[in-house]
Amino acid sequence: MIQVLLVTICLAVFPYQGSSIILGSGNVNDYEVVYPRKVTALPKGAAQPKYEDTMQYEFKVNGEPVVLHLEKNKGLFSEDYSETHYSPDGREITTYPPVEDHCYYHGRIQNDADSTASISACNGLKGHFKLQGEMYLIEPLELSDSEAHAVFKYENVEKEDEAPKMCGVTQNWESYEPIKKASQLNLTPEQQRYLNTKKYIELVIVADNVMVKKYTSNSTAIRTRIYACVNTLNLIYRAFNIHIALVGIEIWSNKDLINVISASNVTLDLFGNWRRRVLLRRKRHDNAQLLTAIDLDGPTIGLARVGSMCDPKCSTGIVQDHSKLDVMVAVTMAHELAHNLGINHDGNQCNCGGNPCIMSATLNFEPAYRFSDCSRDEHWRYLIDNRPPCILNKPLITDIVSPPVCGNYFVEVGEECDCGLPAHCQNPCCNAATCKLRPGTQCEDGECCEQCQFTSAGTECRAAKSECDIAESCTGQSADCPTDNFQRNGRPCLNNNGYCYNGKCPTLDHQCISFFGSSATVAPDVCFNLNLKGEGNFYCRRENTRIFPCAPQDKKCGRLFCVLGPTGNTISCQSTYSQSDLDIGMVDLGTKCGDGRVCNSTRQCVDVNTAY
């Protein structure tokens, strides 16, 4: 017989209700003081981790007992999670701290099916929970008795200021056609399987130097802020079957590595360039968010590029650290990340079931935890139309560093599936009690899984995006769609106007259209003669500050030149460039530069048969 030791830490409601207090969350006008009672059943003599995988607390809210069930947010960190900061002399310092035994949890209130919770248990309980449709916050009180906590409604937190707070994405709803409802989309079985497949976003968060100053160089406080935000992000994105893993944070402790200014569009552009040139080369990730303490322009508290997920430059966002409350900053980050996932602002016709909507253009005083029906439909449409490839990269089971626990929505070593606790599981393929597939089933999720069985061999699971792409089909032996492949590089495309390169057909004309609009075309050869000079922005190669002119045969592999509409008797050579990103405006690699010739990585026009 296994002996069980029942460990109980007393928690009772303190016989006092405060009228006003200053807490870490701000000025609170009405609160209750409680003492947590934690009940944990442990085998006698078993080693107890610092932070258990599951915990249970009992306390009273408004005089009524509640039971808070908490489960550690497994998968919050990736195996290769790293932290980067900078020494006073500017040296980059990267560490890989152990994060197995972290203290961030999701949870629910017993007997409240609509309840949620996002809690840090690092030093007492700090976070928020939803009870009977209302948002409550809990945090430790700085009293001699360290077990005392304050519990209060979100509505009892005084507003920090009355100024409106908005997203910087501008949009004229009247210019858009009505959103086609998900039920109106004529989805193929392959598309439906793709939508049902779980997605993963590997996230990096960068804290700028103003954040460092705001938190008085306390890197622990900055980390705690970021961890709490990402813990809430994960809770929000369960609605889209998306898991967010924090793969790294970077703190610009010495100075900013870009020019962070209040003009949010400029800062976002500079951050995207830095991410593409620097961050992606040393840290694999899908999306990066800049967390800044600078006061962005006007009422703006965030900005992101719509529909840019997985793009090397544009899969980014900027979020102002605008509130003392972690949840408010987390909701803003969720909003900007949703823009990256193809979701625009909600219009008046959008519905969140009477709750504040995450994609409202203006920040609600009450935290928005739900996506509207419009957001869901736009997100699905974006996924179907764009198929962002990076979010299907499922972390390996062995990459999850903490011990497995069944019921946390994350498949770990020894598990075949994980659909949450039995009360919440809606997956007919998975036994929620054991995290094993039910008898007679082969799979629970994937582009090649349908009704718990592997899709038959030959069933298309990824359509070709262009004539340079290849459609992939299921093997009949796996729930996963095979690796995305494309036609061989150098294959003629677009009626011999280009050659395939990494699944696309780059041409000079298409690049001109992307920069200058639909009326733009490639300029005459005389414009490209400017690249022969090797002066200013007109060249083929650059090494540090030194530039090299193009050889005559390579001039169409340097700076791109276009003309805008009919030119008459004069030619206006149009080009574009950026001081922050020197590759912008250069001819793309793989572009046709002559009959049977393409631009290679050193910007030479070479024979297509020897280029790859």
Curated annotation (Swiss-Prot):
Asked whether the UniProt record includes Ligase among its keywords, one would answer no
Single GO molecular function: metalloendopeptidase activity
- Choose any GO biological process term that the UniProt entry carries and state it: proteolysis
Where does the UniProt annotation locate this protein?
Secreted
Q: Name one Pfam family in it.
A: Pep_M12B_propep
Free-text cofactor note: Binds 1 zinc ion per subunit.
Propeptide regions on this chain: 21-189
Q: Where is the signal peptide?
A: 1-20
The role this protein plays is:
Snake venom metalloproteinase that impairs hemostasis in the envenomed animal.
From the Swiss-Prot or TrEMBL record, give the protein name: Zinc metalloproteinase-disintegrin-like 2a
Q: Which organism is it from?
A: Crotalus adamanteus
Taxonomic path: Eukaryota, Metazoa, Chordata, Craniata, Vertebrata
